[in-house]
Design a protein with these regions (language model features):
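Basic, low-complexity segments
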Residues: 1-18
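Short helix/strand-capping connector loops at secondary-structure junctions
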Residues: 13, 49-62
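Basic, short loop/linker segments at the boundary and entry of helix-turn-helix/winged-helix-like folds
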Residues: 14-28
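Short, amphipathic alpha-helical "recognition" segments used to contact nucleic acids or chromatin
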Residues: 24-40
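Major-groove recognition helix of helix-turn-helix-like DNA-binding domains
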Residues: 33-34, 57-80
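Short, charged amphipathic recognition helices of the HTH superfamily
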Residues: 40-50
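Charged, low-complexity regulatory segments of eukaryotic nuclear chromatin/transcription proteins
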Residues: 80-89
């Protein structure tokens, strides 16, 4: 069985551009996982640890900021970013 691709490195802050970025394209699966976790009512700390690979017990502020910014970006993708994908961007 082939190994799955490694998770891409997660920045402390997701992009805030009004355009789709290379980071967004690379982290599209991460955004989907964050949206799924929110829908399921998962604890933010557990999501940060599992999805973003940041331990909230060791780095609570960093974990919270990364989770908040990436979840906000995931929501942006559902409202605006997907349009850039449809246009081939």
């Amino acid at each position: 069985m082939p190994d799955s691709a490694p998770e891409p490195h997660v920045a402390d802050q997701a992009p805030q551009d009004n355009e789709l970025t290379d980071y967004d394209r690379e982290h599209f699966p991460t955004y989907l996982r964050l949206l799924d976790a929110e829908t399921e009512g998962a604890d933010w700390g557990e999501v940060a640890r599992i999805v973003l690979q940041i331990d909230p017990s060791r780095e609570p502020d960093r974990a919270r900021r990364a989770w908040e910014s990436h979840l906000a970006r995931a929501k942006w993708m559902t409202k605006h970013g997907y349009q850039h994908l449809l246009r081939g961007g």
